[in-house]
Amino acid sequence: MEQLRKHLVNSLKGGQAFVPVEKAMNNISRAARNKKPDENLHSIWEELEHMRIAQEDILQYMINPEWKSPEWPEGYWSRPVTDLSDEKWDKTFNGFMKDFIKIIDLVNDPKIDLLAIIPHTTAHTYLREFCIIVEHNAYHVGKIVDIRKALNNW
């Protein structure tokens, strides 16, 4: 089980098959945070805020039997903002990282049987939820990197 925990943590942190979150988010210019390279794409902030919301939802689903998930899809995407303040950016980034650390801690918790069904669910295991986070974050980190490249901010 320890090898599986180690593998999950490495997968969550990235750097094996995709860019680590910290690297993807490093040195983003203020001007690029809320800019769309194309009208059909999201901004970096919109992608990160979506990641924060989805990650929080999955974390709370695992640890809080009373948690109610947002409505799909509108509850998982914030409305675009025209003026993104530093405070709003920091709230999104710090919220994402805070939950990310909680997820790593949960993966490493020896009291959690990764293969067990989450007690207040009917069929979902911790492993399933952690794998969804890995996949989802990897996908959106890739989109953030592409947006940064398109904005000449990579």
Task: Give the role of each language-model region.
Residues 4-12, 18, 22-25, 30-77, ...:
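Short, contiguous alpha-helical
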